[in-house]
Amino acid sequence: MEIILATETWQMAGAWYVRIQAMAKKHHITLDREFDALDGPDMRYILALDGDFPVGTARLYPLPDGESMMIGRVVVLPEYRHKGLGTAIMAACEAWIRDLGCRTAVLESRDNKTEFYAGMGYRITGDAFIDGDTFRCIRMEKRL
């Protein structure tokens, strides 16, 4: 298993493939809702590969405060879950955030995944909200 910073078109396509397979198809999310204006050529993606096959991803983008980065769309294909890959993807995100000079990682967790992130040191910093009429989410943060 390898985790990389997606910088080439094929790598970004791999990140999108994982999101389509694990989120859009499973949860019946239309592509125009899964892929928003942030998913452009300047988006930063982490990609987990099993050989050449994409199996997990996350995206990162800076927040207006200049000190924080949002981690979003953290997804692992179902057959690769519960093997530490999500934790490894998050560690890669946090390392990249530090390398970019930011001090806080922010995410909006689905309410049934907050324990996963709390186990990595994230704390709840906001009230629950509905994201895209699909998921109940909660904002969480971690100082790096």
Where in this protein do the model-derived segments appear?
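Short amphipathic alpha-helix that is part of the acyltransferase structural core
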Residues: 1-34, 39-40, 45-53
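Conserved active-site tyrosine of GNAT-family acetyltransferases
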Residues: 19, 117, 122
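Conserved beta-strand in the GNAT
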Residues: 47, 53-62, 68-75
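A conserved beta-turn-beta hairpin within the catalytic core of GNAT-like acetyltransferases
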Residues: 62-72, 81, 131-137
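Conserved acetyl-CoA-binding loop-helix of GNAT-fold acetyltransferases
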Residues: 76, 82-95
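Conserved GNAT acetyl-CoA-binding A-motif
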Residues: 90, 97-110
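Conserved catalytic-core motifs of GNAT/GCN5-like acyltransferases
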Residues: 108, 123-139
